[in-house]
A protein has these predicted regions:
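Conserved ASCE/P-loop NTPase catalytic core
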Residues: 2-195
Length: 195
């Protein structure tokens, strides 16, 4: 039995042609830069975004990499993958379909960017990082429902990562940069406030 909830099929969405076209174009060419969908409650914004998941292509990722690095592009690898690539030239890879990564409305800065893994620091005395949502979003779709309700500093961090394609985690004297290339899709209801 699957734990995933059923998703409404993209082809079953009636109307909303400009929205569907914009979603498809972003899936075809992620360098477009993302999409902001505005509309009143109940117009199918979230349903359309979630339905896109069934049409997303497969991507290659480095097996076991927390940051979903691409095994074939050294310019978009974390430090660990790049070091392994330089030594062995071939990274273990796996293939999977791109996913819709949801950003919760109450997400903290540490949850978005990444943080120090306190459990390992206390138990083992080592400084280990806990990857954030921007790591999970690499080579995926980052979906923000009600983006207009997010705190400005969280929006700024996401836009910085989206524009540069990189996220930097800086905590407790540790600094790690990793690729964070994603399709950014936000939805908002203008009745609840503007961006």
């Amino acid at each position: 039995m699957s734990s995933e909830r059923p998703v409404y099929p993209f082809a079953a969405i009636v109307g909303q042609e400009p929205l569907k076209l914009a979603l498809l174009l972003n899936a075809i060419n992620p360098q477009i830069g993302g999409l902001l969908i505005r509309g009143p409650k109940g117009t199918g914004k979230s349903t359309s975004v979630r339905a896109l998941a069934g049409l997303l292509p497969e991507v290659s990722v480095v097996k076991g990499c927390y940051f979903n690095c691409s095994p074939s592009d050294p310019t978009n690898m974390c430090e660990n993958c790049l070091a392994t690539h330089r030594r062995d030239a071939k990274l273990p890879e796996t293939h999977r379909r791109m996913r819709i990564v949801n950003l919760p409305i109450g997400a903290t800065e540490d949850r978005v960017v990444g943080s120090l893994d306190i459990e390992q620091a206390i138990k083992l005395g080592i400084r280990a990082l806990e990857p954030g949502i921007l790591a999970e979003a690499n080579q995926n779709v980052l979906y923000i429902d009600e983006v207009n309700l997010l705190p400005d500093h969280i929006v700024d961090m996401i836009l910085d990562a989206s524009a540069s394609g990189w996220n930097t985690i800086e905590r407790e004297g540790i600094s790690i940069a990793h690729p964070s290339r994603f399709i950014l899709v936000g939805t908002m209801n203008p009745e609840e406030g503007e961006l």
